[in-house]
Amino acid sequence: MARVSRGVQAHAKHKKILKKAKGYYGARSKVYRIAKQAIIKAGQYAYRDRRQRRRQFRRLWIVRINAEARNNGLSYSRMINGMSKAGIEIDRKVLSDIAIFDKVAFAKIVDQVKQALSV
């Protein structure tokens, strides 16, 4: 039986891993074994942080809505409660943009919310 040389496949595999690790510091970009570990860890961080990014944006939107709602005499929780009672279905992302860029429209929304809360 003939001997199988896997040099071409091994070289391609190493090259692929080292290409992904380009820009890493020290041995993480030079040594195959360490580069492979670094890429696996980077993938774990990327997976985790894609989920954290969504949470962080939601927190940011809530902070912005709360700040502008308090400027108009409401807390965030009462604002959201009043919006559901008034039947206003604007998500937090859009509401935070309105709070930043269109304060007049946000004030009108707050007035509608206050009317819904007083009834």
Swiss-Prot record:
Pfam families: Ribosomal_L20 (PF00453). Keywords: Ribonucleoprotein, Ribosomal protein, RNA-binding, rRNA-binding. InterPro entries: Ribosomal_bL20, Ribosomal_protein_bL20_C. Gene3D superfamilies: 6.10.160.10, Ribosomal protein L20 (1.10.1900.20). GO terms for molecular function: rRNA binding; structural constituent of ribosome. GO terms for cellular component: ribonucleoprotein complex; ribosome. Binds directly to 23S ribosomal RNA and is necessary for the in vitro assembly process of the 50S ribosomal subunit. It is not involved in the protein synthesizing functions of that subunit. NCBIfam families: rplT_bact (TIGR01032). This is Large ribosomal subunit protein bL20. It comes from Vesicomyosocius okutanii subsp. Calyptogena okutanii (strain HA). The lineage of its organism: Bacteria, Pseudomonadati, Pseudomonadota, Gammaproteobacteria, Candidatus Pseudothioglobaceae. The gene is rplT.
